[in-house]
Structures are given as structure tokens and as C-alpha cells.
Amino acid sequence: KRYQAFHAEATPELPALLAYTGIVFKRLNPKDFSAEDFGYAQEHLRLTSFCYGLLRPLDVIRAYRLEGDVVLPELGNQTLFSYWRSRLTDTFIEDIRSAGGILCNLASDEMKSLFDWKRVESEVRVVTPEFHVWKNGKLATIVVYTKMSRGEMTRFILKNKIGNPEELKGFSWEGFEFDESLSDEKKLVFINGMGE
């Protein structure tokens, strides 16, 4: 029923950046973006989708619900992960190179599986922000905070037109601050000390 409705004319089409409604996109809050913000996003932001592959923010899509481990019998029983991997990796690498050769990776680990990630990391510079909180005297990753922080950082990048990973260190939100001692050139660690 869901898949039949997907092609129905009544199913609304929206720009990808406005179509998604999860925690990351709520914190990103593109509804208040200016035309300039959308223009910068269109050039510098890419969204990953099990249904559509690699999207630019203004690509028009229909709402859908789909998991990456769906098997495609018509295509030799491969999953969506393997289907997209061979189709997206080259395009993704070229996109990153044409935008300066540096990727700020704010995608979930699951979405990285849409690409040959080892190849991506070997051909372009990948910087991955991590978000941790102190809990019971240890650093912990709390999924909801990670998702919210990814959305907020994406907003920070787009609103401030950030192009240099060094500028990401200035990100601060809800107690999350950059921690130089836990970071390196591949990962930028942000810590919230609320549970110390």
C-alpha cells in the first residue's frame, strides 16, 4: 500500500532539504533559510537516501520510508546498500573534489554503507565530528544528542558558509564544546560535560 501511494499524484513532492522530518532535520531547521543559505546548501551539502541515492538539497522528492537492507530480487537479490555503492561512490568523490576536496562527514555509519567508504577516505580528506557526553565518569555517545548535534552543526556550517575544517572547532551548542585533546585531523570531538 505504501509503495503504491508513492507514485500517486496526491503524494506531495518537496525539495529534499524540506522533505525530511527526523531529529537531524528538525535541528537543521531549513524553514528559516534565506535564498543565500539554500544556494550555499545546494553547492555544498549532499543528502543520502536509500530511495534516491545522493541528493542535493533542492532536488524534488516524494516522501518515503525505506531501509537499506531491503533485498532487490530483480537485481540478483542485492541489498540497497550494494545497489547504490557501485553507482554513487565515483559521483560522491567527484562532488567532494569539485568543492575543495574536503568532506565534513555528518552522516550516520549506516549511510556511509551506501559508498565504498575506504575509497572515499583514500581519495579525499574526510573530517568526522563526534559528539560525546560525560555519563557516570565516562564519555558516552547518546544517539539523540548525536543526531541533534549533527543537525545543529550542519546548520552552523550552512549559515556561516564554512569551508575550512578549522572553523568547525568554533561550533558550540547546548554545552557541546570542541576538545582538542581527543581530536585529530580526521575526527573533531565535541564534549558536553553535563554528567561529569
PLM feature spans:
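Active-site helix-to-loop segments that bind/position phosphate- or nucleotide-bearing substrates
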Residues: K1-D32
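Internal, well-folded beta-alpha domain core
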Residues: P30-D184, V189-E196
